[in-house]
């Protein structure tokens, strides 16, 4: 069974073709709008939607030409339906529905977060058995789930304010750095010369629950930098290190608690922040020291992409899900 996946929830236009029977990604294409939005310091929804309109058909033509496949080979078209920018979601959903009607192909709505959660399966070496704990950590979400089977997601904890990735981006903005901020902060943190110069709080780290809070950490960065008389690049790097160290410390601590609480031994990490080198290193240490198995997405699939939507759509389709080609129902916000 072969599925075409379409991702358009924010500022990445992604198409991919996934073969469920072989559990193999056949092809994927991605167009990033980062350069377009960089001068605005963040994503402009109207521009994002227009770029999706301009690029979707071009990417579709390219992916079919490169694979030698045609729409006759496609069994299902999966598209991101929620959550995301409504205009951007509408573009992708309309494109999917139109193709479905023209070529008489079933369509299936995919939850963006489910796509991320399953993205480690895109690594051919990943053989993830249920149940497991999943940390979904991105610019819009920071959530811990217990996953007992496909489609059975029990929320264990989440951020009560800023998501971790959002805190990275806002910290970058506070320090006058570029967009996307998370990458800028992580890169500058690598240049720290005095890693103990700044000590920042670890919000909710010692709380018994599995919720997160990052707004206080962001405020601590603001106050620390405001009070710093020597706002040199060197000290900015030291502060980036302190921020990243605190944020990652909280994430790792909560993962450890979640594994203990649920008595699971498998941990799956996904979302844009899963590409962070320090997070991967610290979680690898946790797994090694306590005998856990840990799974990350391939680096290229940490951020939004069509491959994760094609794969999640394939899993949903074989489990009996599909929707009417005449209905379009997208949502800006929707829990998994």
UniProtKB/Swiss-Prot annotation:
Cofactor: Fe(2+)
Keywords: Acyltransferase, Cytoplasm, Iron, Metal-binding, Transferase, tRNA processing
Residues bound to Fe cation: 112, 116, 304
EC number(s) per entry: 2.3.1.234
Cellular component annotations (GO), alphabetically ordered: cytoplasm
Gene Ontology terms, MF aspect: iron ion binding; N(6)-L-threonylcarbamoyladenine synthase activity
Gene3D superfamilies xrefs: 3.30.420.40
BP-aspect Gene Ontology terms: tRNA threonylcarbamoyladenosine modification
HAMAP family referenced in this protein's UniProt entry, alphabetically: TsaD
NCBIfam families: gcp_kae1 (TIGR00329), T6A_TsaD_YgjD (TIGR03723)
Family: Belongs to the KAE1 / TsaD family.
Identification of the protein by name: tRNA N6-adenosine threonylcarbamoyltransferase
Source organism: Francisella tularensis subsp. novicida (strain U112)
